[in-house]
Regions:
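Short Ser/Thr-rich beta->loop micro-motif in glycosyltransferases that lines
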Residues: 85, 234-239, 260-262
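Membrane-proximal helix-turn-helix segments that form the acceptor-binding/catalytic region
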Residues: 100-132, 228
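Conserved catalytic-core segment of nucleotide-activated headgroup transferases in glycan assembly
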Residues: 159-223
Length: 302
């Protein structure tokens, strides 16, 4: 590895899934200068050792399991940016799951009774983050409601991001022969499948006489190849899904995309442009991230 300039902190330093794929794409161009750490293994020694590096902090649910002193040290004395993939300020990961799973209106992160550590953590993030990045405009708007002290001039919207290899993979399969069916992703069972609206997607297809097939979970490359052979994708999440990759992948594969307002990026201007313009926009998002980092996020070592 080359010299370490950045510390990437996330719930899992190496993982699969949309969050990990987007995180990898954002960091791809400088991966040789990034050390990845997982929240659950973070120590006070590591926080202090890399005090002069820029920390790139992603999902932090596992951070709440640590000694609060470690969190305070990290967010008070280190340089960091925060990437908000979903709704880490809530233990249920958002307003809708909070309502459905706890039967309560979400007042996070400042519901002290529910989880004071989340509240104090986000107070420090809002106060000390050099910049915060969001997946969609509507996600950022929800954060601003829950954290009214958040400064918009220190925030940006990225969207989901894709590696160069993923763009190549999507382009390879975009011209595949399409059958006459619509795909519904099966999810990972339990609450995940419920949140992703599997039942709602099935009901939508039945109501509208749309032939569909449930797509089982596969390795990423096989998933893209299989998905590419469908006429379209039906995705009806019941939660605020900040910028679901699956609908972007489907669009870049030339599929008809049927989704709802809970796919939060679909109200943004870039989503309704041509495939070529969408691809250009998406390819520039990691560059946008690093441009902001380079211009605004200096450390003592810079």
């Amino acid at each position: 590895m080359s010299s370490v300039d950045y510390i990437h902190l996330d719930d899992q330093s190496i993982a699969t899934g949309g969050t990990s794929l987007t995180g990898t794409a954002i960091l791809e161009d400088r991966m040789d200068h990034i050390l990845s750490l997982s929240c659950q293994d973070l120590t006070i020694e590591e926080v202090q050792r890399y005090q002069n590096k820029l920390w790139i902090i992603g999902n932090i649910t596992n951070l709440y399991r640590l000694d609060p002193n470690i969190i305070h040290e990290l967010l008070s004395n280190n340089f960091f940016v925060k990437i908000e993939f979903d709704y880490n300020f809530c233990p249920y990961r958002g307003e809708i799951p909070h309502q459905k799973l706890a039967n309560q209106i979400c007042k996070c992160p400042h519901d002290i009774i529910l989880n004071p550590l989340i509240s104090s953590t986000y107070d420090l993030i809002i106060k000390n983050a050099k910049h915060s990045f969001f997946m969609s405009e509507r996600q950022r708007a929800i954060y601003s409601i829950h954290m009214p002290l958040m400064r918009f001039d220190k925030t940006s919207v990225l969207s989901s991001c894709f590696t160069k290899n993923t763009f190549d993979l999507l382009k390879t399969h975009a011209l595949n022969y399409k059958n006459n069916q619509y795909a519904i992703l099966e999810g990972y069972g339990g609450w995940h499948s419920q949140a992703k609206g599997v039942t709602e997607a099935k009901n939508f297809c039945v109501t509208n006489n749309i032939p569909y097939q449930i797509l089982p979970n596969q390795s990423y490359d096989h998933h893209i190849e299989t998905l590419s052979k469908f006429k379209g994708l039906v995705f009806m999440p019941i939660i605020d899904d900040t910028c679901p990759r699956c609908v972007i992948e489907a669009k870049l594969l030339n599929l008809d995309v049927l989704t709802n307002i809970n796919s939060q990026h679909t109200t943004e201007g870039w989503w309704n442009k041509s495939l070529e313009q969408i691809e250009i926009y998406l390819k520039n998002r990691p560059k946008h991230f690093w441009k902001i980092v380079d211009e605004n996020c200096h450390t003592n070592a810079s």
